[in-house]
Amino acid sequence: MPVPHRRLLCTALTLSALLALTGCASAASETTPDAERATQTGPLGDDDGYIPEGSSLPLDSGKPAVQRLDPALLGALREAQASAADRGTEITIADGWRSERYQETLFAQAVQQYGSEEEASRWVKRGADSAHVAGDAVDIATADAMDFLNRFGAEWGICQTYANEMWHFELLTEPGGECPAPAADGRG
């Protein structure tokens, strides 16, 4: 190959590589802040409120998933636990407070599972929209404890929030009040 053609080919390949790199950088800069938080390096851990699947925490745990719950919710749950224990039921949580990063990770997983953001939003809220991120919600670990809170939780203001999530509870009424009917799903 003559030298001028080789230079032309080398220049063309260099320009192509630069354009490709510029395109990648541009696409990367278009990611949303929520997506960036959800993909921060490192696995989810205690500081995110992560509780491994199949595990649960007692209400006296020192882990952030429990300790970062709203004090009123945690206090109500502990009072309910005392009554539940008298009936042979232990209240433990499968999820409590979560970091926004953890919540966004759960939402991204739900989108993959359900195929769309709309369908995923029936089951998981986005980042800061989640009551878990505010420390205002818990997911109860056992069916016995869910049943106990559904029957007696209003005594402490604790109510099931969504009809499609029998495990999800929040403070939704005054202690001794009446729980509102659960919303159909996370969309309200």
Question: Which residues does each PLM region occupy?
Answer:
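Secretory targeting and sorting signals
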Residues: 2-29
